[in-house]
């Protein structure tokens, strides 16, 4: 794979997506994300304030953190307002406090955290009521009654408001924390203290066996975006990338396929693992995906939100780390796709030469195309969404499970950090590792870098999914709703 430098000439523009484009629509998007947050934290104080796993924060930390983030960007950055509560920023700075340290902080009690969220939201909605179009091209708005923000360049405010970017950033941020809350529920459910919340368990479509792979011919395609108003800085700019011919599986790896890897001794065969992966496997005594266990009679169970159930063989495997995915791929004589291969298989339309916003086109996700937004607390069976297939015939690229790729998280040619370095840029460069949960030194460097994940999971909101969306995490992560699919060279 090669990127054509920083030159974006020749890039086929992707049409502007159907993202909410008015203050009223942005307000509804904010309210929708808040409904999920409040549903996942509708608990007594004890389970809200307890740390259910050193991998995660107490739920009450996430609850107030999303309010603080909203205050920072939708009140202070846009209007120049002062802090709603003194000292609030220091308490909820994710970079300052490792997750293991957060239970000891003087966090807002649940009732005060909810009151803080309501206070911030009320002020934000009042500000939204004052928005009016700016006299410049594009979807630009600003508070009509607010003077220039002290210390904030007018150009930056305009850019934050272009296409409602800053509102989309806050909406997506809250939905991402909602997915983190669900992962905490899954981890905490082992003690019987948490449930998945009040979401309705919708019936998911039946699967259909469409095993096999598709061939993606060599050639350039447009990777990333320069037009999606809600895209993060790490998705920008759109640029041309040449990808050699490759083959990629039509569907993610199933529980059935990964069980075959387990029962063939894959977790005990050092030859299949990278040195770092084998060291991690031995340290953590990995023998199967997280939440799998033997049933005592030769079968397997999966623990899902407080209950054990027979392992569903035809669902995508989830709760595997990057090292497990890599070892499985080697066992199968395959490899993980690169990030560029994944996006080309997902978005490129060879008939038009342009990239789509989603595998099926530019229309937003529907229940017929993808399993998103916590419709159910599990992935759908493989082959359940033929209507969501890409132009190459690859299915279930959006929703169900995040997918590990082979690629390190890195900047695109021409990357420019916006609106703050700590969202993307600080994660591009490998740095001295420390366990983000405990803050302990990491001499084996398992926490040194980040691998790219693509596609979204059953718990991801549709606003935080698109063909260009990039997620990233340490290669040891298993508690997230992540799986993988396999690829290989064409020759």
Label each PLM-derived region with a short phrase:
Residues 2-57, 61-68, 73-86, 90-123, ...:
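Disulfide-stabilized, aromatic/cysteine-rich ligand-recognition loop
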Residues 54, 158-166, 199-208:
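Membrane-interfacial loop-to-helix junctions in multi-pass inner-membrane proteins
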Residues 126-132:
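Polar, glycosylation-prone regions of secreted, cell-surface, and some intracellular proteins
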Residues 170, 174-176, 180, 186-204, ...:
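Functional-site microenvironments in short loops/helix caps that host divalent-cation chemistry
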């Amino acid at each position: 794979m090669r990127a054509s430098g920083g030159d974006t000439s020749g890039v086929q523009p992707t049409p502007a997506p159907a993202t909410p484009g008015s203050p009223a629509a942005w307000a509804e998007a904010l309210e929708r994300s808040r409904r999920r947050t409040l549903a996942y934290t509708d608990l007594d104080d004890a389970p809200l304030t307890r740390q259910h796993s050193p991998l995660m924060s107490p739920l009450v930390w996430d609850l107030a953190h999303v309010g603080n983030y909203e205050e920072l960007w939708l009140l202070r950055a846009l209007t120049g307002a002062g802090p709603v509560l003194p000292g609030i920023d220091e308490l909820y700075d994710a970079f300052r406090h490792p997750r293991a340290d957060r239970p000891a902080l003087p966090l807002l009690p649940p009732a005060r955290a909810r009151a803080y969220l309501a206070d911030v939201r009320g002020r934000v909605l009042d500000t939204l009521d004052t928005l009016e179009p700016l006299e410049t091209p594009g979807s630009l708005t600003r508070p009509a009654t607010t003077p220039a923000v002290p210390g904030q360049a007018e150009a930056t405010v305009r850019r934050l408001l272009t296409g409602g970017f800053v509102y989309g950033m806050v909406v997506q941020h809250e939905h991402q924390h909602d997915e983190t809350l669900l992962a905490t529920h899954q981890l905490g459910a082992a003690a019987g203290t948490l449930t998945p919340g009040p979401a309705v368990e919708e019936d998911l479509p039946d699967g259909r066996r469409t095993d096999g792979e598709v061939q993606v011919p060599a050639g350039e395609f447009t990777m990333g975006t320069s037009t999606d108003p809600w895209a993060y800085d790490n998705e920008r700019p759109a640029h041309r990338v040449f990808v050699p011919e490759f083959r990629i599986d039509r569907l993610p790896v199933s529980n059935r396929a990964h069980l075959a890897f387990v029962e063939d001794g894959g977790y005990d065969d050092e030859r299949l693992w990278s040195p770092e992966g084998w060291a991690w496997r031995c340290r953590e005594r990995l023998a199967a995906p997280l939440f799998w266990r033997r049933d005592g009679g030769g079968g397997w169970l999966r623990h899902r939100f407080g209950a054990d159930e027979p392992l569903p063989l035809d669902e995508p495997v989830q709760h595997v780390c990057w090292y497990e995915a890599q070892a499985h791929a080697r066992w199968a004589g395959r490899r993980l796709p690169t990030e560029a291969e994944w996006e080309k298989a997902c978005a490129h339309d060879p008939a038009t030469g342009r990239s789509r916003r989603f595998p099926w086109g530019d229309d937003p996700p529907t229940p017929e195309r993808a399993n998103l937004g916590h419709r159910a607390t599990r992935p759908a069976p493989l082959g359940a969404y033929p209507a969501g297939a890409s132009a190459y015939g690859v299915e279930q690229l959006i929703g169900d499970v995040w997918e590990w790729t082979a690629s390190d998280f890195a900047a695109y040619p021409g990357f420019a950090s916006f609106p703050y370095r700590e969202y993307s840029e600080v994660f591009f460069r490998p740095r001295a590792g420390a366990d983000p949960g405990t803050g302990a030194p990491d001499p084996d460097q398992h926490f040194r870098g980040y691998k790219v994940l693509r596609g979204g999971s059953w718990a991801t909101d549709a606003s935080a999914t698109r063909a260009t969306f990039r997620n990233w995490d340490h290669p040891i992560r298993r508690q997230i709703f992540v799986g993988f699919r396999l690829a290989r060279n064409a020759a």
